[in-house]
Amino acid sequence: MLSEKQYLDLYQSSSRVIKKNSAEVLNAVRDAAFEDFRRLGFPSRKVERYKYTDMSAIFEPDYGLNLNRLEIPVDPYEAFRCDVPNLSTSLYLVVNDAFYCKALPKVELPEGVIVDSLNKIAAENPEFIGKYYAKIAKTDEDGITALNTFLAQDGLLIYVPKNVKVERTIQVINILRSDVDLMVNRRVLIVMEQGAEAKFLFCDHAADDKNFLATQVIEAYVGENASLDLYCLEETHYKNRRVSNVYIEQQANSRVNHNVITLHNGITRNRLDLVFKGEGAECFCNGCVIADKNQVVDNNTLIDHQVGHCTSNELYKYVLDGEARGAFAGRVLVRHGAQKTTSQETNQNLCATKTARMFTQPMLEIYADDVKCAHGSTVGQLNDAALFYMQQRGVSREEAKLLLQFAFINEVIDKMELEPLRDRLHHLVEKRFRGELNKCEGCKLCK
């Protein structure tokens, strides 16, 4: 309760400052979100979806917050070049929880496409933002989402109009920077109109060696016949705590490709809630996790088949070394009347040491009788016979271990449809297994 009380006291004492620096449409839901948090609090391990990670411990330390929206000095040209060779991107920066618009090269986007500050657009067009903001990210169902909603002051809006295809990948670099331990609360709102197509690459980095706590809520609306590719890559450091809740709503015949990659972190908790609202939609959800030392990565997913004739595919793979701890809980819910549903959920895990720990819980909950659904999970160690075979042919034990780990994780990397990113991940993962990569390789401030 101590950790909850400090956030309740914070809002009661600082709500005027928070609202002063935010658009009215964002403020309109704050008080209700605050009351939801007062009622729900931080989810305990008794809550099924949070049984593997102690959320109160993550939020208990005393972090600073930039409620007065003081400008954080950055040099985007020197610091934040998160390069993916051979991938042409439109580059945007979010520093802590604020959209950064200064001294960036002008980005040419198709007519009508918007990538801008959520707070800015909310002030300019409150009717549009009010139609979507905090609608599928329900504060009365999750304490973390409620906390983010009453504290968040800015973030990112991405809007793609009807039948517009964005050819270049939109790359968003989320940078954590501070001279003191800091908490940031970031919002992302993605609206894809009917027939729209776009690819997004979100890269999370920590530029300073401080204790960071980042909460993030992403709401994505994918219209009829629209296509959304979302790649989320985390390369922070061991002092970083990240809690990300992603909510996706799909209409008829839409397609979503959601990929979450964790290469460096401290404690990471990713939640994905995806709901099918129209028939003929499909989603592909992939997760790639590499963790060692005392790192923790917890992925929790819910795929909600509310209508029939939809397809979902999930593949999450973990490689855990040292005393790392991983968790995966994936629930596929097929509701009454959701006939002709097809679903495959797979979680495969490799513990490279005896001290690494993995918790896995794939779940199917089916209330329709004409479906094709399967799920499975495995947890194992390196194959001693394969190691021996390779050593007999002159391969050192360490090199053999690396090759087997790389072959194991390769399956999920190869499902990434962005070929340049796929090639980049092969390079980063190999260096990670060799112990040559301690944090982000591409950003100068991260060195």
Predicted regions mapped to residue ranges:
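Conserved beta-strand/loop scaffold segments within soluble protein domains that form the structured core
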Residues: 106-115, 121-395, 409, 413-447
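N-terminal amphipathic, basic helical "cap/leader" segment at the start of enzyme domains
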Residues: 1-146, 315, 321
